[in-house]
């Protein structure tokens, strides 16, 4: 999804202070031309400023002839999500403006990075067949991480929304921009509202994608939000059937442990799957296949759990849980009641970690801004739902709100959203934004659109598993050519049917992948069954040719065709 753009025009707009004046260094990820990366040195705690930390950032200078003086500054959500990798993507959205991507303090590209592999391993251990003993549980693991960070001199009290917002204000001052346009998504929408309130003279406009207002009881609401998202997708009943079935009889699924680099057999209950789905639905491509996926899981197609479990493991391994929990334990968890235990282990796990860490409760900011604000929400978003985002947006004095038929982080999935954001930033005072279709969710897959099977995902991990298909396609092509040259019609038609089958399957898979690559984790195109008759016809014609004339090419082709059909029907279909 990340689009890299390199522009070659000379910079002609008046210069501002460059990032080289704020501790430049090499960029940790690939960047477009004219991008500088660096660190902003700030106090770890502004109320006790002795210890310093470094906040990572990148600045991509626009090369447009009509370059505007006010850049766009972007921060990802999380907490603890990285931002720099989106620099090129954002530069394409705003070609006439500099783009600044700023990391959160304590995240991967800041120093120190508050990684907690102990916590990630304990959370992954939730899926192991044998429950962890208290000494190996989540709270104990989080405490080991906390103690290790303390030994490094890190004070977790300095990692909260208030300090992160102050870092953004300090970066504008350091880079020398008179004004800039704030762009936040998910958690960082809260940060950007705080920045706008703290630095009104430096803010020209604000974009809030998937708005998470401070007033929301996020943990208390999440089970309801997930149920509402399933209802809007039309699979609330199959979802509950799936959860109940797997809670009664948990599935056993082979999963790769990304931290240890080896497979283990996970025990996945319905609540575990609900937790993983709640995270996965933040991706618009997953949302599009969710109706087919949930319905298949409700019917017992547990082999589809492998890609979900692998994705969950990869997500755990890539997250800085020290920062995540430091923020949540100060700014989010204390403002929820937890009167009802959640079905989601991440919700309960965050409460468990915060009970163990005992960080101080933050003071509510109740920030607002008079700057023009554009708020975007996704209809199927279970994380920052319209139910809470839209009223909060309307409470901002100069805000407008748009709903899109997609999920979380609207701008990543919707070209229309990107157009509207760019139009708003170009003229925040305009009362009318160029219209475009907000129905931007990748086309949802109906039951008839997919032949449910886990085989494509298995092949994506081990391409050699597709060898029978490749062998059949090559053998069919050879059979067609040689039989046609020798005037053997039956064998030639058998080869032609095989080539047609292989070509149609390849074309339909490629078309589906271009439409939504994630769909291949759920199955093959629905036309697969129809095309299979061509493979059967190829085998029948080849067998007839063999019966008519027993030659070794016919024998080989018949063996390959028969073996392929056994593989196709018993494993792939």
Short names for language-model regions:
Residues 1-18, 40, 168:
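Secretory targeting and sorting signals
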Residues 18-263, 267, 326-328, 332-393, ...:
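Gly/Pro-rich cap/lid or specificity-loop segments adjacent to the active site
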Residues 154-157, 263-264, 276-280, 313-316:
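Second-shell loop/turn segments in exported
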Residues 212-230, 293-295, 301-313:
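Flexible "cap/lid" loop of the alpha/beta hydrolase fold
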Residues 267-295:
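P-loop NTPase catalytic cores that bind/hydrolyze ATP
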Residues 283-284, 293-304, 311, 315, ...:
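Short loop/turn hinge sites at secondary-structure boundaries
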Residues 299-302, 395-401:
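Structural alpha-beta junctions
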Residues 303-332:
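Long, low-complexity segments enriched in small/aliphatic residues
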């Amino acid at each position: 999804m990340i689009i890299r753009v390199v522009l070659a025009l000379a910079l002609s707009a008046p210069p501002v202070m460059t990032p080289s004046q704020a501790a430049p260094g090499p960029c940790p990820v690939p960047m477009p031309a004219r991008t500088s990366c660096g660190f902003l040195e700030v106090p770890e705690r502004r109320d006790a400023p002795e210890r310093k930390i470094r906040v990572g950032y990148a600045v991509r200078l626009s090369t447009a002839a009509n370059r505007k003086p006010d850049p766009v500054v972007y921060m990802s959500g999380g907490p603890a999500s990285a931002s720099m990798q989106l620099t090129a993507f954002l530069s394409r959205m705003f070609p006439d403006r500099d783009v600044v991507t700023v990391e959160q303090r304590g995240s991967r590209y800041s120093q120190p990075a508050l990684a907690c592999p102990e916590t990630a391993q304990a959370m992954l251990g939730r899926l192991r067949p044998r429950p962890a003993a208290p000494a190996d549980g989540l709270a104990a693991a989080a405490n080991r991480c906390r103690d290790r960070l303390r030994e490094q001199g890190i004070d977790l009290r300095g990692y909260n929304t208030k300090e992160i917002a102050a870092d953004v204000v300090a970066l504008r001052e350091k880079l020398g921009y008179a004004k800039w346009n704030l762009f936040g998504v998910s958690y960082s929408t809260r940060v950007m509202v705080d920045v706008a309130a703290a630095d009104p003279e430096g803010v020209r406009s604000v974009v809030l994608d998937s708005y998470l207002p401070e007033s929301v009881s996020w943990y208390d609401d999440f089970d309801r939000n997930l149920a509402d998202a399933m209802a809007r997708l039309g699979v609330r009943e199959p979802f509950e059937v799936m959860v109940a079935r797997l809670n009664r009889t948990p599935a056993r699924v082979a999963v790769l442990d990304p931290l240890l680099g080896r497979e283990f057999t996970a025990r996945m209950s319905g609540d575990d799957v609900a937790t993983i789905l709640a995270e996965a639905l933040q991706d618009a491509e997953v949302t599009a296949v969710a109706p087919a996926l949930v319905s298949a899981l409700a019917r017992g197609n547990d082999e589809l759990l492998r890609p979900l479990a692998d994705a969950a493991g990869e997500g755990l391994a890539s997250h800085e849980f020290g920062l995540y929990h430091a923020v949540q334990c100060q700014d989010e968890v204390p403002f929820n009641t937890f009167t009802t235990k959640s079905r989601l282990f991440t919700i309960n796990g965050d409460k468990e970690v915060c009970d163990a860490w005992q960080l101080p409760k933050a003071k509510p900011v109740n920030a607002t801004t008079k700057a023009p604000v554009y708020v975007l929400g996704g209809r199927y978003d279970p994380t920052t739902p319209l139910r809470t985002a839209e009223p909060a947006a309307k409470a901002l004095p100069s805000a407008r709100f748009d709903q899109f038929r997609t999920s979380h982080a609207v701008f990543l999935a919707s070209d229309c959203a990107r157009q509207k954001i760019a139009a708003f930033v170009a003229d925040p005072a305009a009362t009318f934004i160029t219209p475009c279709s907000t129905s931007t969710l990748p086309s949802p897959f109906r039951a008839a659109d997919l032949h449910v099977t886990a085989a494509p995902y298995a092949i994506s991990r081990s391409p050699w598993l597709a060898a029978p298909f490749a062998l059949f396609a090559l053998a069919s092509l050879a059979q067609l050519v040689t039989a046609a040259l020798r005037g053997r019609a039956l064998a030639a038609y058998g080869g032609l049917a095989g080539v047609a089958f292989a070509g149609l399957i390849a074309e339909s898979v490629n078309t589906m992948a271009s439409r939504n690559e994630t769909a291949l984790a759920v199955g093959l195109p629905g036309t697969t069954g129809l095309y299979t008759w061509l493979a059967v016809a190829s085998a029948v014609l080849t067998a007839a040719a063999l019966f008519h004339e027993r030659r070794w090419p016919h024998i080989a082709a018949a063996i390959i065709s028969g073996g392929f059909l056994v593989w196709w029907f018993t494993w792939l279909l």
